[in-house]
């Protein structure tokens, strides 16, 4: 087993001609795709992995300097694709991993057939002519809550992000993977995500992009998906689902899985 494979817990499933890469967002790990994977393995080779810093990875491998920007994660994705000799893939990125895919696709467009983004945002902070959904003051309070009592913060953050019923399995699952992260790593990663601004990179994306999001998402207002659609350099399409929450593939799989499969199977009509 190579160091990339071991560090990221890479798994290759299925045996199709085309490769689908599933990349998870903050506070989760590859298990967030458990409802989708069974529907893909008969038709595709599926690559799943854990982002460095996830609770399932070795915290000793987490390099705070490397992962102080999203580029570090993008180069991890490229390293995984090269390690497993993936010629070109359909990349499905959730939340921050959508933007990681954007960066990776600009660096190596040859490795990506298309991007399918779920709950993606190029910038979370509001700006002069841009609505991201957050003010700096909100984020500073969030960071302080993480610092003071990480477990209590997880218990409050998970229901807000997932939405819906407080007792749902999805909230329990997200709470578990969130709490699995080492608190100092979680804070560093979340600050990096929330303070990043990738709007300037969008025109440089050349691969087609399928933008999928919930109608109601605390972290990503619907206008952000429209912003992505208007500013991405390649062809793009938006689908807003009748779901609630930032992790709809976990909380509303009955709605989301058919939508994801459709966007994975079919290309944008030119």
Swiss-Prot record:
The active site is at residues 95, 217, 246. Its EC number is 3.1.-.-. Keywords: Cytoplasm, Hydrolase, Nucleus. One of its GO terms (cellular component) is nucleus. It is found in: Nucleus; Cytoplasm. It holds the Pfam family Abhydrolase_6. GO terms for molecular function: hydrolase activity. Its main location: nucleus. Expressed in stigma. Hydrolase which may be involved in plant olfaction during volatile communication. PANTHER family: ESTERASE-RELATED. Belongs to the AB hydrolase superfamily. This is Karrikin insensitive 2 receptor CA. The gene is KAI2CA.
């Amino acid at each position: 087993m190579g160091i990339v494979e071991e560090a990221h817990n890479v798994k290759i499933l299925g045996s199709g001609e085309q490769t689908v890469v599933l990349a998870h967002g903050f506070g989760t790990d590859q298990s967030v795709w458990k409802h989708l994977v069974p529907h893909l393995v008969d038709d595709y080779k599926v690559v799943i992995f854990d982002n460095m810093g996830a609770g399932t990875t070795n915290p000793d491998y987490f390099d705070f300097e490397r992962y102080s920007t999203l580029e570090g994660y993008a180069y991890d994705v490229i390293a995984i694709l090269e390690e497993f000799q993936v010629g070109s893939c359909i990349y499905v990125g959730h939340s921050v991993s959508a933007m990681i895919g954007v960066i990776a696709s600009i660096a190596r467009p040859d490795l990506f057939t298309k991007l399918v983004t779920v709950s993606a945002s190029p910038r979370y902070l509001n700006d002069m002519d841009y609505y991201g959904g957050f003010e700096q003051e909100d984020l500073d309070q969030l960071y302080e809550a993480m610092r003071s009592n990480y477990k209590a913060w997880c218990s409050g953050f998970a229901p807000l992000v997932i939405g819906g019923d407080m007792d749902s399995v999805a909230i329990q699952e997200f709470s578990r993977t969130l709490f699995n992260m080492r608190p100092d790593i979680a804070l560093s990663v979340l600050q990096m995500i929330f303070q990043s601004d990738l709007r300037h990179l969008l025109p440089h994306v050349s691969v087609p992009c399928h933008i999928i999001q919930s109608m109601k998402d605390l972290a990503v207002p619907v206008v952000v998906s429209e912003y992505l659609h208007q500013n991405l350099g390649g062809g793009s399409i938006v689908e807003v689902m009748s779901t609630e929450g930032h992790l709809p593939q976990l909380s509303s799989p009955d709605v989301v899985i058919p939508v994801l499969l459709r966007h994975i199977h079919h290309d944008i009509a030119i």
